[in-house]
Amino acid sequence: MSLPKTANGMDKLKLCYLLLFYLGSSSLTEVSGAQTCEIDSVLCTSDLSEPDDPPIFHDLTTKEIKSVQTYLYHQRDLRLLRPGLAKINTSFIQGMELYLPNKKDVIHYLQSKVPTPKPPRAAVVTIFRGDCDPAVVEEYIVFPLPWPTQHRLHRKVPYYLRPFNDVEFATISDFLTKQVDGVLRQFLEESFGGRLINCGNRCLNFQFASPVGPSVSNEPGARKSWYWLHQLVEYSALHPVDFAVLMKIVGCVYTIEKVYFNNMYFNSLQEVALHYRNPSFPRLRIPYPVDSKQLFSKMERRGILFPEKPVSPPRQVEPEGKRYSVKYQEVKYMNWKFNFRLSPGLGPRLHNIRYHDRLIVYELALQDIVVFYSGAEPPHQYANFFDSSYMIGMNLQGMVPGVDCPTGATFIDSHILTESSLKPAKLINAFCVFEQNTGDFLRRHISKTSPDGPFYEGVPSIVLVLRAITTIANYDYTIDFIFHHNGVLQTKVVPTGYILPSLYTKQNENKYGFRLNNKLIGNLHHHLFNFKVDIDINGQHNRYETLDIVLDKTSHPVSKKPYDVWYQNKIKHNLRKTEMEALFKYDFDKPMHHIFYNNNLKSPEGNNMAYRLVNRGMSKSLLPECSGNEGTGAWMRHQIAVTKRKETELTSSSVYSAFGTKNPVVNFRNFYADNENIVDEDLVAWVTMGTYHIPHTEDLPVTHTPGLDLSFFLSPFNYFPEDPAMGSRDSVRIEAVDKNNLKRGIKIDKQTFPEKMTCKAPIGNYFEYILKRPNVIFDIQ
């Protein structure tokens, strides 16, 4: 929906805010006795409607999704069933997303100086073919959009590798509940104080599953998972009961293969029941928790309240309107311009990132989030989670203004297709965009005396942030793409949410974590994040070089000691020529800078006009290569890996990663195993960040964020003749009228610091809005 044209600027402003009313944006309110906060409505150019003719990087529109559905449902050979009728042994659409044209075609279209036809749009559609023998996952490319007439098979994947989905979860939950309740109802009630069926307010539930891939079970084609039992109170992850079942799925046959209870393994539910009838059988009593605001696992305000009175916290304002625009998933901000979209499986991706209209990054995209737990009992021992298999992008929804993003941010919905809905599902508030003052400065210096001074010059650190938050079961991950005024691009990840503890026993005390209360151990786990950075510095023919900082042994001319030497550091240029040479594992004894450049372009000083990659979130994986599930995440072996870009190597992971550990659908090791030349080639940097988390009592009920943020940066390195932010109107310069006579006063040069403007910060009506529409934030049907 476009903004209506009006004669009055303030009317236009109100319409702009009305378009975003539930997002927390509102016009600024005049404070009594203060100057009115006049806003230049021209700046407020956000258009969050869907285009009739989508730009090349735009997500599939609802019209395109519906037309692809209609086309596929008419293909009788696919035997597709509609949502609601689909079962795991039928054929149904699992999801779809944009399928980008080849990069060469896209670059040609973007850079053409004459009118050029846009490459045709297409969708990649994932279909679960449970109706086939053998069952299989099929991916099809459907084109051209918006009115498809053709489709072709993209790839086939073994059915046991399929990602988790609602249809399967419902089937498994029903199977486990009936099987376990039918055999062990009395056992569960006496041991854990609750039931699986007809449980009232004392419910037990199989909330979490630890996948066991073929490389772990050494049973090709088998899809296994340990399902953990929890007491179903807020939050269930903090109420484990030391009971789990190993479920095996082959085709459409479900069996319970093992049962774990109280540090003992059993071959069946019946075996547990038989032993339980024996009076000598070790009992375990875990009382069902009393639900109250004081329950340790509950996120309810409690303890000593602060501040002393309910005084509102600080809020930022935009006194003259927004300084960025969003239209058709393209953001323009100062000298930056970029497109963004959402992959339902792998999460947020940015494209065509430009600074001063010069392409810096063709694609910046999350690839996977991995969490590897450790523990004494099987649910934690095998808890190696590849979150792509849980559909990272589908779990973006419900960011709250004033907490998750500033109140005045622009909130943006995404539309996806899920297997459980015939219509495109709207992920409300999937993204937010906002400009903020970080409270730091971009640069500053003060010189108080002659001969240089007296003067002061400084620029506040103002940035634009594109944010997405994905919630995968118990954990929440904030993913920020941060655009600095000086051409620096920052990518930041912050984990928070609930930990997955285990029941305290003597066997796991202190070995895998600390005791958090009278019944829990906070299990050690390792978070890892992988990003793709398709760097294009002055074109697609780039080099990757490390500037190695090495010891320089030189003469010591001022020393009176004969043959004395002086040690300092020097730079050694190290051009990485092949992919194997471009695998980086951090070594504290070998400091270096990582730079990317086009060798055919030099600065006036003769330097390579480069961008530097800085990884400030490095974490080493200790797992032996190819052990357990490690092979699926081969990217975690290196903090940076640089490879030659290929259309067949578009992602380092896939939604099939959880069970594909024996023969991964995407094997990242193959990206560099052929050891191709990377000199003057189109290069991709694969950046891995991570952190080890040893939970402590302050992680109850929820892990806090300070100290957990991880970032990597792309920073200009001899790319500009000087700081490109020297032109910032946000700068302040203070100097003496006469530097030899301060008594003559000072002069102040500032352009964006209004002196008499006193405004209330935007409050918005978001909370009133969700009272009437709770599905905005929660999955309520």
From Swiss-Prot:
Residues 1-34 form the signal peptide. It is found in: Secreted. It comes from the Eukaryota. Disulfide bonds join 199-203, 405-432. One of its GO terms (molecular function) is copper ion binding. InterPro entries: Cu_Am_Ox_Cu-bd, Cu_Am_ox_TPQ-bd, Cu_amine_oxidase, Cu_amine_oxidase_C, Cu_amine_oxidase_C_sf, Cu_amine_oxidase_N-reg, Cu_amine_oxidase_N2. Ca(2+) 2 binds at residues 579, 671, 674, 676. The modification 2',4',5'-topaquinone is found at residue 475. Ca(2+) 1 binds at residues 534, 536, 682-683. Keywords: Calcium, Copper, Disulfide bond, Manganese, Metal-binding, Oxidoreductase, Secreted, Signal, TPQ. Binds 1 copper ion per subunit. Its cofactor is Cu cation; Ca(2+); L-topaquinone; Mn(2+). One of its GO terms (cellular component) is extracellular region. Belongs to the copper/topaquinone oxidase family. Homodimer. This is Putative amine oxidase [copper-containing]. It comes from Margaritifera margaritifera (Freshwater pearl mussel).
